[in-house]
Amino acid sequence: RTVIENAEEVVYEEKKMEEMEVTFLMDRFGYMRTIDKSAYERNKEAANAENKYVFNCMNTDKICIFTDNGKMHSIKVADIPLVRFRDKGTPADNLSNYDSAQERMLYVAPLASVKENTLLFVTAASMCKLVSGAEFDVAKRTIVSTKLAEEDSLIFVGSADEMEQVVFQSEGGYFLRFQKQDISAMKKTSIGVRGMKLAEGDKLDHAYLLESRQEYTITYHDKPYVLNRIKLSKRDSKGTKPRI
């Protein structure tokens, strides 16, 4: 005999994750973890000393990883284990498409701050540009962060909003300091403009962002070298060699 049942479909509602602020930690080997904010406050000194990247972010946000081969990988904060302070982190390779054997991290930040900022991109061939961080607010786990010429690679990606000047340093020991506003704002799909005229065979190995009111000192040939003292020039000039 036929039984007619008034069976309603059972709907399982996924429990919404409670939104909260956590502290993201990543060491120089690319092992990442999130910890409770109060655990960070208690272990602040050790956390800052042992980790390359330390910042607070929402557990509903994403972490953006910009690498030297012109890629940006993103990881949901919720996918990064929330652990006790002394627990080990998880390699970025296991949580994203990032491949530590093939690429190097240049800049790591939460998407919430990336999209509010302007980023400076600098390549070894001295191409540079400013890009609105909103261009990196995408759903894909990996995107091309910039267009690179063949054989070129990124040497610097960083938040540029607070800064007024840039310094480029080449492998051959040349330095060029100029105003950030000399760099064009462009789309992420563009190659950029030339920052410093390089001699044949020379390439950039460092770029720095400076605030004009603050002194920035690096170690060059084992001696302190103040970047603010470099003659202020124009973009697309030749650099100068320090007399050290």
Could you tell me what each predicted segment is?
Residues 1-244:
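C-terminal interaction appendages of subunits in large macromolecular complexes
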